[in-house]
Amino acid sequence: MDERLLSGESGYEDADLEYSLRPQTLRQYIGQDKAKHNLEVFIEAAKMREETLDHVLLYGPPGLGKTTLANIIANEMGVNIRTTSGPAIERPGDLAAVLTALQPGDVLFIDEIHRLHRSIEEVLYPAMEDFCLDIVIGKGPSARSVRLDLPPFTLVGATTRAGALSAPLRDRFGVLSRLEYYTVDQLSAIVERTAEVFEVEIDSLAALEIARRARGTPRIANRLLRRVRDFAQVRSDGTIAMEITQMALELLQVDKLGLDHIDHKLLLGIIEKFRGGPVGLETVSATIGEESHTIEDVYEPYLLQIGFLQRTPRGRIVTPLAYEHFGMEMPKV
């Protein structure tokens, strides 16, 4: 997959920045009002009852703040957080080691929880339901099962693919919160806050321009801000003004709706070779040289969100809005 400025996935540079910018409380957290207000109630109720919070599943596109919310949940509950990921837990023993190290009330955060192997999920079921762990000691006829008690804990799972979770695992979460794309105003506030942390002056119109092209995603907004800051320092006086912002974003090939060269390649490929569709996913994959799951999980969600692409039983169809964006006429049927 091409290196992509507009990917919602986290890179090493993003991780360092996000840690320094991460809000510590729900009150400081910008956006996701519905999820935030619900979590506020659930956390307060759990604290009033002196209980652990129900297990929480956070799902939605990458870059919307799932890891940040997991850390805030632990902070609001006044407990420690232990972080791991689905791909990092390769064997049941790996999960057992993590679970037995938890202290009472701790939050266990599993990112990409949809990538847990089914055999590991089965170990997780009694841990989530009964706070116990069934482990097998020995092999063959002499093998025996031993049940270990675990301290009460809260599992917070994060996934970009809620549908990929098995039903038994999904049903064991008491709180399910879908994170939505951010509004331009919310992203603009995030950009201005990040600029303040960077100690760089930014024009409010420039912050709005970055926000408009950030695909509804804070991680992308902050990444664009970093790149625009570079242009402002090298090609201007260091202040992020509207003119330098527009110039930088054009040079970075990020158009006014936040589409980049890969989006253009996908949409124009369907328009020019298949008269706008419908065309099957595998055919699109072969045409633009990208794996089908990458197209489905990474490229398409935003195009669907802004109404440039439709998924139908017959295949992908480019919409009139996309034709208009490219200044092209739709073919006559």
UniProtKB/Swiss-Prot annotation:
Signal peptide: none annotated. ATP binds at L21, R22, G63, K66, T67, T68, E129, D130, F131, R172, Y182, R219. One of its GO terms (cellular component) is Holliday junction resolvase complex. It is found in: Cytoplasm. GO terms for biological process: DNA recombination; DNA repair. Its main location: cytoplasm. Residues 1-182 are annotated as: Large ATPase domain (RuvB-L). It is an enzyme of class 3 (hydrolase). Homohexamer. Forms an RuvA(8)-RuvB(12)-Holliday junction (HJ) complex. HJ DNA is sandwiched between 2 RuvA tetramers; dsDNA enters through RuvA and exits via RuvB. An RuvB hexamer assembles on each DNA strand where it exits the tetramer. Each RuvB hexamer is contacted by two RuvA subunits (via domain III) on 2 adjacent RuvB subunits; this complex drives branch migration. In the full resolvosome a probable DNA-RuvA(4)-RuvB(12)-RuvC(2) complex forms which resolves the HJ. The RuvA-RuvB-RuvC complex processes Holliday junction (HJ) DNA during genetic recombination and DNA repair, while the RuvA-RuvB complex plays an important role in the rescue of blocked DNA replication forks via replication fork reversal (RFR). RuvA specifically binds to HJ cruciform DNA, conferring on it an open structure. The RuvB hexamer acts as an ATP-dependent pump, pulling dsDNA into and through the RuvAB complex. RuvB forms 2 homohexamers on either side of HJ DNA bound by 1 or 2 RuvA tetramers; 4 subunits per hexamer contact DNA at a time. Has 3 domains, the large (RuvB-L) and small ATPase (RuvB-S) domains and the C-terminal head (RuvB-H) domain. The head domain binds DNA, while the ATPase domains jointly bind ATP, ADP or are empty depending on the state of the subunit in the translocation cycle. During a single DNA translocation step the structure of each domain remains the same, but their relative positions change. This is Holliday junction branch migration complex subunit RuvB. It comes from Bacillus mycoides (strain KBAB4).
